[in-house]
């Protein structure tokens, strides 16, 4: 039995239209009932306080319960609580039966009208008085206050009012709505001049149409769901409900077409009706007027009270605001509202602190306004087809989706340190007004408080303009600021809770912490915690602590750099590093410390490397303490740093000199360079434990106390606050090069000095690593890599792993292999969107556009070399004129290379440094070549636009962009194939194939990305051993809740097919809607933006500059390039002049020696030098060291290649050189000539070379630098032609291979036989038996035939005992290989070995003997403990623990090999004299033995191994032991 069956038990009889309530009551009882209802509502006041303007909580269950208490007295008996909806129905039936009620009296059927009157909640809401916070019309404005009203009477009025408004949608010429609320007479009338109701008799129902629609239930003109309507009516109740709950209901209709006026009166809750009065009507205007007298007694009312009138008046103003073209009047007073925006202003009239309201008419069907909510809770006033949806619905969610998303992005951008702000959190700070027209709307009930229609059925979309969204996001709105402020408040509260149990403790257990013995005790203030940079530094600190004692000193290693905690509250809570420090020190968030007695340590000592990164770590620790506990920094002696040398110099037995800063060392070296050995201490790990003990033994000289100063507060914020990025730019620009801190022996250091003299050096170095140079377009890591490749003359391919080591060694690279690996790979990549000119050659898998290069192979698998075009870009003749950087005491890469064209525009860049970031697109090198030629000729440069090698799409200027600077649109390529199908053959720049597949999956199945993200988080959490944070709540989703995937709420893609390769794009997509109805470029993201607004670079002087246009950048580059061409010409001229003099002097010298004018034998060195001076031979000191190196290369070229020669010459230059005095150095080129060159033939050759050099010199002097530049541009253009030809050849190769390939798919796998299926089913999966491998051995050839037969039989027996039925498929496969197997190998898994055989590394090789074995083969199963156990075991003798030696008899037939399939051990066949059938298992703890190599005639390669493993095995076969 259901509750509904019990609802009719209070009525036993009566007329069909007699009111059930009137029958059972007497007149005096009604006021008492009303009074009791008021008292009941008063008891629910606390619940009413929870109501807001957006949620009119009708408390249906409560009202239903009370209704049953008042109306069901006959049913319920004395026990009033038994009538509750939650009581057992059967108890009520039993109670009624005891009172003598019959079954017919208990189970009743009601007519619909009686049921509506008896149970009105479903149709009009509660008929009991209740109190709620609502908007009402009062004092000529909208007021939000507590209202006492009856929802039912409010609803019947709303039905009539909305019906009048619906006429506006049916009849566009409708002009007015007139509403009269007569409090004295107790009636309400609503009049509109819309299209009149036809005054004629309905042919089916035989009554007039007005009577049909106003006097009969379930009648409506809205039952055709195929018709698109923008009205509020739907179910056929509407105005009839007002008739039913009225004592009198008058319908008056004027129809100008039939010229009739219709008037009819209904009474007694629509049960009684008068005959319609039809008169003549001559006016041209139709109208409909409804007048009704609500049955006040039924609603517990005596009259229209003030609250009800205020609430009904508000609804009249709603209609006026939603229909601004209508003249709406209330009690004959026109309201004068001509727009929805003006209506919204009624909510904020003349308030000083009124929030700014942002309004936009999105379309003819959507109007939207947003403002800040003062109550920090979501408020909404919304209308659907003039219906006031007090609880919102899907229309509010949809209208706000784009706005909430934009606010979310903005807030998360400014609040990066905290958890992502959810849409529901943002909505709590908004007040929104929505007025919309929805096709055929669906509501949660007849009360129409909530819209439930799907967004796809709205018939229109609400997409606010970007201008409107920007206004909402503007700081003046206060919305973003309010959300940020509240989010930060929550974060601070969470921080305080995270350390609520912290404070001073005895012992703490944290991994890697070496706690001081007295930490956390009474003497904790005397204890010092040493924070070190890594584990190796902690080892050094531990060694030092052994000197000063462990009672007062503890050590804890940091994992790299600490988090910048400013604006990072949520990340701080989840940061293990910071939490550990807080726990170790005993700190509490939010506590203001005035003494150190509450902490576990009274001092915090920072011990980091003395390099730039070490300075940064110090600064981050200072920043953390300053942000959370600033008073600690003011306490002298709390924060301390420990300094160690960065450089030490040694000389003979003198005491080493230590330097604690690089500028300090460089200054010393200017005057003390000779005879000193230099050792660089780049990290604390360079120091030995002994040196660590020395440092701590002199602790007072190695520690520096930080001291608070007046500017400390501002300087710390300057260095670490995100809001002061512009100030940091100025801070770095004002730094004077060469400024450094005097550290050793200094007792105190102010925070301002640390920030401005030490930390600033890190910020500058960070920018140098991250931002490229305008001259060569390279960052420091790229430049070091290119320098090393040029130095090595890298024309042969080497592994990237090898190159990483070479770069680290020869260019003093200090930042780890992973960083250098990404640099090298990035310089070699050539897929679309990477490099226009790749300077390194990608030999191997360097990544593709499938994953944007992330799918590259490991450094040990890929090779590289210098690309041929590299030297066309960076000409070798420019190398000698470049100034080099000194690092680790040696010259390394130049400050910048000087390319032929501005490479900064060729390959572009993306980089983020301290205070600066840079983003430069790629451009066509041919455009740059053309512009350089124009600049040479003195002509203006042509504008260029971004260009990407291999990109097939278009790049166009964004004409509508308001961004300062250039902006371009990168567009992919798509083509319509049919009405619901199109293909994509190119993606915009920066969109990779895998990313695009994920987008298509999302468009096909919305929510896919979210599910993948959740799965990823769960996996990450499982690896960490923690629970993944839920991304969704378990509560039921409300219709006004935001969806995380609002942007993709419905499927757009039906299916798609991917034909893309590693270099091409090809998707064929089938859509649900026709292609023409979809904005393909927007929905499928086929357009991306490319900006020229952040082109930041270092100039040639090391200053950071921002360029507004590419033209300005080229104009800056060109004069610099011309200057260096002049420098190149001067250098080459000087070198040719030197060569000319050298050759001339050599010829004179040899002639003088040959003619005996100069005697060089048995002459003192001093006399010889004086003689050379007397003969006026030129002193030539070799300034151009590169020249001698090249000469050596040329001499050695025949012996080995250029790369080896370059390395060799470099080693010779770096080797020890003989010290010479100045006089000898000048004539060394003469005195070092070999004796065999002192001939006349040599003189002749030297004179020819001299004349050739003179000619070359003259040509150089006569060639203008502009001509030299043009030659280089021609050479580069030729190299680009070769690059284009290479790209074209790759395309042609793919096409030709496609045509050549005949097989499109592999042949299908063949079905297995029924016998195999049966055997497989019979063999239990848990007892897999490995195939037995037999190695037949040879014995004496004179063995008798009987013995041979016996041996064969024994072998067969042995085989059968060790071979399972599940090896039959293997046997059948191998049977094809050995057509004539010998008895010794019968039923074994032996495979013929020929030249084409491929097999695994774990094999047993055996040779078939000339004669059968003398002894029976025995099977031994060896443990697979090591793969190194091999055939050598057969040489160990006949002992069971040592297999017999392999027969040396040469094989008569091809050797066979036994493969090991899915087994964990190896099987060997040996001879055994004691037993023919015994199977022996060798012990698993047998010592590993080296593998015996196979016979030379059986050399083979494992098909599954790669070459590297092969070479490694060959080179280190002995290592297997």
Swiss-Prot record:
Biased composition (Acidic residues): 1-10, 1201-1222, 1422-1438, 1503-1521
Keywords, in A-Z order: ATP-binding, DNA-binding, Isomerase, Magnesium, Metal-binding, Nucleotide-binding, Nucleus, Topoisomerase
Catalytic activity: ATP-dependent breakage, passage and rejoining of double-stranded DNA
Feature: compositional bias, Basic and acidic residues: 1468-1480
Segments of this protein annotated with the region Interaction with DNA: 412-414, 1085-1094
Localization of this protein: Nucleus
Gene Ontology molecular function: ATP binding; DNA binding; DNA topoisomerase type II (double strand cut, ATP-hydrolyzing) activity; metal ion binding
Residues given in the record as Mg(2+) 1 binding sites: 533, 609
Sequence ranges assigned to domain Toprim in this UniProt record: 527-640
Sections of the chain in a coiled coil: none
Residue positions binding ATP: 163, 192, 220-222, 233-240, 446-448
Active site, renumbered: 861 (o-(5'-phospho-dna)-tyrosine intermediate)
Site residues, Transition state stabilizer: 860
UniProt keyword DNA-binding, yes or no: yes
Binding site for Mg(2+) 2: 609, 611
Summary of subunit composition and partner proteins: Homodimer.
Name under which the protein is recorded: Probable DNA topoisomerase 2
């Amino acid at each position: 039995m259901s509750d509904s069956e019990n609802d009719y038990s209070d009525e036993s009889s009566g007329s069909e239209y007699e009111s059930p309530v009137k029958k059972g009551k007497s007149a005096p009882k009604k006021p008492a009932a009303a009074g009791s209802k008021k008292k009941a509502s008063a008891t629910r006041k606390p619940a009413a306080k929870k109501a807001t303007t957006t949620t009119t909580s009708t408390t249906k269950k409560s009202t239903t319960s009370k209704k049953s208490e008042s109306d069901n007295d006959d049913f319920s008996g004395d026990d009033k609580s038994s009538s509750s909806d939650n009581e057992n129905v059967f108890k009520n039936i039993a109670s009624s039966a005891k009172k003598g009620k019959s079954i017919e009296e208990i189970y009743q059927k009601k007519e619909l009208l009686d049921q509506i009157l008896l149970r009105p909640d479903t149709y009009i809401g509660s008929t009991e008085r209740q109190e709620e916070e609502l908007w009402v019309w009062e004092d000529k404005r909208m007021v939000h206050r507590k209202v006492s009203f009856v929802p039912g009477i409010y609803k019947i009025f709303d039905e009539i009012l909305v019906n009048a408004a619906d006429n506006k949608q049916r009849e566009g010429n409708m002009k007015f709505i007139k509403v009269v609320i007569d409090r004295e007479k107790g009636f309400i009338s609503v009049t509109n001049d819309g299209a009149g109701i036809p005054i004629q008799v309905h042919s089916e129902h035989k009554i007039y149409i007005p009577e049909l629609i106003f006097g009969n239930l379930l009648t409506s003109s809205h039952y055709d769901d195929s018709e698109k309507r923008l009205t509020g009516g739907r179910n056929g109740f509407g105005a009839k409900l007002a008739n039913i709950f009225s004592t009198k209901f008058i319908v008056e209709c004027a129809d100008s077409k039939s010229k009739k006026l219709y008037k009819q009166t209904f009474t007694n809750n629509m049960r009684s009706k008068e005959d319609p009065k039809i008169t003549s009507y001559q006016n041209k205007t139709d109208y409909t007027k409804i007048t009704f007298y609500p049955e006040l007694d039924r609603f517990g009312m005596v009259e229209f009270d003030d609250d009800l009138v205020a609430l009904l008046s508000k609804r009249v103003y709603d209609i006026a605001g939603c229909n601004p073209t209508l003249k709406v009047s209330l009690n004959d007073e026109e309201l004068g509202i001509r727009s929805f925006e003006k209506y919204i202003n009624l909510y904020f009239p003349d308030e000083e602190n009124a929030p700014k309201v942002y309004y936009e008419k999105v379309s003819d069907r959507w109007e939207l306004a947003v403002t800040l909510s003062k109550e920090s809770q979501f408020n909404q006033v919304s209308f659907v087809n003039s219906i006031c949806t007090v609880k919102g619905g899907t229309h509010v969610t949809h209208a706000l989706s784009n706005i909430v998303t934009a606010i979310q992005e903005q807030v998360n951008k400014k609040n990066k340190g905290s958890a992502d702000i959810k849409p529901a959190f943002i909505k709590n700070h908004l007040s929104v007004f929505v007025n919309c027209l929805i096709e055929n709307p669906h509501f949660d009930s007849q009360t129409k408080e909530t819209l439930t229609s799907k967004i796809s059925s709205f018939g229109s979309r609400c997409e606010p303009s970007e201008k409107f969204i920007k206004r909402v996001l503007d700081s003046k709105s206060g919305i973003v600021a309010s959300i940020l402020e509240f989010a930060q408040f929550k974060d601070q509260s969470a921080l305080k809770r995270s350390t609520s149990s912290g404070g001073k403790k005895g012992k703490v257990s944290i991994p890697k912490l070496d706690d001081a013995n007295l930490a956390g005790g009474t003497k904790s203030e005397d204890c010092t915690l040493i924070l070190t940079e890594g584990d190796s530094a902690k080892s050094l600190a531990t060694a030092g602590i052994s000197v000063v004692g462990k009672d007062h000193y503890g050590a804890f290693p940091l994992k790299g750099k600490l988090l910048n905690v400013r604006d990072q509250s949520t990340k701080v809570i989840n940061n293990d590093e910071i939490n550990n420090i807080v726990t170790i020190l005993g700190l509490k968030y939010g506590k203001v410390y005035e003494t150190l007695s509450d902490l576990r340590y009274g001092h915090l000592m920072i011990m980091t490397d003395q390099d730039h990164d070490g300075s940064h770590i110090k600064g981050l620790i200072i920043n953390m303490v300053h942000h959370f506990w600033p008073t600690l920094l003011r306490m002298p002696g709390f924060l301390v740093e420990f300094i160690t040398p960065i450089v030490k110099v040694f000389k003979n037995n003198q005491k080493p000199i230590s330097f604690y800063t690089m500028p300090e060392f460089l200054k010393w070296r200017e005057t003390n360079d000779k005879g000193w050995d230099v050792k660089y201490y780049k990290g604390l790990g360079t120091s030995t434990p002994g040196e660590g003990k020395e440092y701590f033994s002199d602790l007072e000289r190695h520690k520096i106390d930080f001291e608070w100063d007046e500017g400390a507060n501002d300087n710390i914020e300057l260095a670490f606050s995100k809001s002061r990025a512009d100030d940091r730019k100025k801070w770095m620009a004002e730094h004077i090069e060469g400024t450094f801190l005097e550290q050793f022996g200094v007792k105190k250091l102010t925070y301002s000095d640390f920030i401005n003299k030490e930390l600033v050096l890190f910020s500058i170095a960070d920018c140098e690593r991250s931002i490229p140079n305008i001259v060569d377009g390279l960052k420091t890591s790229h430049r070091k890599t290119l320098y090393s490749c040029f130095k090595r003359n890298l024309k042969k391919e080497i592994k990237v792993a090898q190159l990483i080591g070479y770069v680290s060694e020869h260019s003093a690279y200090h930042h780890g292999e992973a960083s250098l690996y990404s640099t090298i790979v990035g310089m070699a990549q050539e897929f679309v969107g990477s490099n226009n000119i790749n300077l390194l050659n990608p030999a191997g898998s360097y990544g593709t556009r499938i994953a944007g290069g992330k799918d590259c192979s490991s450094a040990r698998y890929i090779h590289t070399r210098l690309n041929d075009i590299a030297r066309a870009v960076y000409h070798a003749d420019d190398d000698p004129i470049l100034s080099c950087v000194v690092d680790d005491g040696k010259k390394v890469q130049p400050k910048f290379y000087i390319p032929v064209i501005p490479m900064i525009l060729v390959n572009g860049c993306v980089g983020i440094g301290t205070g600066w970031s840079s983003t430069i697109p790629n451009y066509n090198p041919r455009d740059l070549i053309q512009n350089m030629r124009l600049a040479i000729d003195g002509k203006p440069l042509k504008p260029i636009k971004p260009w990407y090698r291999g990109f097939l799409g278009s790049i166009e200027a964004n004409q509508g962009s308001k961004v300062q600077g250039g902006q371009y649109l990168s567009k992919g390529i798509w083509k319509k194939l049919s009405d619901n199908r199109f293909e994509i053959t190119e993606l915009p720049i920066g969109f990779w194939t895998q990313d695009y597949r994920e987008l298509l999956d999302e468009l096909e199945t919305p929510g896919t990305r979210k599910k993948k993200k959740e799965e990823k988080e769960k996996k990450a959490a499982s690896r960490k051993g923690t629970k993944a944070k839920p991304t969704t709540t378990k509560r039921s989703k409300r219709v006004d809740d935001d969806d995380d995937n609002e942007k993709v709420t419905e499927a757009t893609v039906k299916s798609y097919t991917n034909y893309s390769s590693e270099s091409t794009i090809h998707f064929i997509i089938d859509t649900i809607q026709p292609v023409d109805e979809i904005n393909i470029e927007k929905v499928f993201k086929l357009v991306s933006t490319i900006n020229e607004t952040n082109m930041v670079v270092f100039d040639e002087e090391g200053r950071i500059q921002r360029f507004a246009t590419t033209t300005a950048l080229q104009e800056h580059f060109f004069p610099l390039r011309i200057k260096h061409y002049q420098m190149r010409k001067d250098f080459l001229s000087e070198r040719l002049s030197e060569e000319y003099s050298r050759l001339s002097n050599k010829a004179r010298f040899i002639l003088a020696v040959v003619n005996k004018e100069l005697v060089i034998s048995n002459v003192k060195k001093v006399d010889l030098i004086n003689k050379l001076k007397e003969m006026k031979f030129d002193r030539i000191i070799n300034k151009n060291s590169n020249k001698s190196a090249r000469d050596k290369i040329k001499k050695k070229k025949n012996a080995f290649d250029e790369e080896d020669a370059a390395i060799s010459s470099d080693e010779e230059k770096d080797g020890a050189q003989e010290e010479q005095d100045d006089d000898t150095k000048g004539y060394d080129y003469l005195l070092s000539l070999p004796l065999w060159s002192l001939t006349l033939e040599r003189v002749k050759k030297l004179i020819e070379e001299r004349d050739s050099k003179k000619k070359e010199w003259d040509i150089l002097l006569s060639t203008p630098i502009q001509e030299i530049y043009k030659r280089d541009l021609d050479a580069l253009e030729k190299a680009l032609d070769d690059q284009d030809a290479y790209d074209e050849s790759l395309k042609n190769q793919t096409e030709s291979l496609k045509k050549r390939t005949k097989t499109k798919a592999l042949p299908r796998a063949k079905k297995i036989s029924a016998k195999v299926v049966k055997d497989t089913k019979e063999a239990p999966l848990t007892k897999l038996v490995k195939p037995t491998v037999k190695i037949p051995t040879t014995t004496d050839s004179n063995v008798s035939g009987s013995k041979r037969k016996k041996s064969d039989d024994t072998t067969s027996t042995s085989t059968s005992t060790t071979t399972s039925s599940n090896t039959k498929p293997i046997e059948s496969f191998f049977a094809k290989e050995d057509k004539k197997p010998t008895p010794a190998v019968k039923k074994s898994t032996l495979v013929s070995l020929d030249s084409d055989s491929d097999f695994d590394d774990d094999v047993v090789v055996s040779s078939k003997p000339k004669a059968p074995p003398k002894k029976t083969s025995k099977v031994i199963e060896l443990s697979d403990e090591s793969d190194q156990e091999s055939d050598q075991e057969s040489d160990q003798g006949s002992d069971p623990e040592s297999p017999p030696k392999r027969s040396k008899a040469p094989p008569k037939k091809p050797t066979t090999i036994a493969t090991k399939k899915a087994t964990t051990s190896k099987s060997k066949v040996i001879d055994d004299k004691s037993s023919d059938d015994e199977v022996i298992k060798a012990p698993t703890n047998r010592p590993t033995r080296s593998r015996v190599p196979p016979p030379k005639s059986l050399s083979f390669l494992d098909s599954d191994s790669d070459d590297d493993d092969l070479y490694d095995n060959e080179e280190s076969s002995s290592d297997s032991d």
